[in-house]
Design a protein with these regions (language model features):
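Charged/polar positions within long, soluble alpha-helices
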Residues: 51-54, 104-111, 127
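C-terminal capping/gating helix-and-loop segments adjacent to ligand/active sites or protein-protein/ligand interfaces
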Residues: 79-111
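Acidic, carboxylate-rich catalytic segments that either coordinate divalent cations
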Residues: 112-129
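Generic structural concept
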Residues: 39, 43-46, 96, 100, ...
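Broad gene-expression machinery/nucleic-acid interaction feature
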Residues: 8, 101, 117
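Residues that form generic nucleotide/phosphate-binding pockets
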Residues: 68, 83, 98, 121, ...
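Small-residue-rich helix-loop
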Residues: 1-91, 129
């Protein structure tokens, strides 16, 4: 369920629908999903999106992405390719880097407002589009 909701949230960001992305994040918080678990799933999704963007730039197709990530179906690879068309390579690279930075902060800073940091990160992703 978490991966599917993160997929929805990332698609909303790439579609410039911040309200929908924020609603998904709020739903995950209401379900008491740990912020670090949300970030881990988001990190994977952003890395996959970056891979799809690189595939597009390299004239590769969804099957290549599917095989690389060992997906069992074409559907998620096709959706990734569709989302990747809406973002630039630099946006993807920066999103992955910022995600890594937030991950280090969440794991090392005491008394961090992890939910607030995730909300801010989501707004930054949406705003940087």
């Amino acid at each position: 369920v978490l991966d599917a909701r993160i997929f929805d949230m990332t698609n909303a960001v790439t579609a410039r629908d911040y309200d929908r992305a924020a609603a998904v994040l709020a739903e995950l918080f209401r379900m008491q999903t740990e912020p670090i678990a949300i970030l881990a799933a988001l990190s994977r999704e952003l890395r996959q999106l970056y891979t799809a963007r690189l595939a597009l730039d390299g004239k590769k197709d969804a099957v290549w992405v599917k095989d690389l990530w060992r997906m069992t179906s074409d559907y998620p690879a096709k959706k990734l390719m569709q989302s990747a068309r809406a973002v630039s390579r630099s946006w993807c690279r920066d999103a992955v880097r910022r995600c890594q930075t937030l991950d280090r902060r969440m794991k090392s800073e005491r008394n961090m407002d992890a939910e607030g940091a995730l909300k801010l990160f989501l707004m930054e992703l949406a705003g940087a589009r």
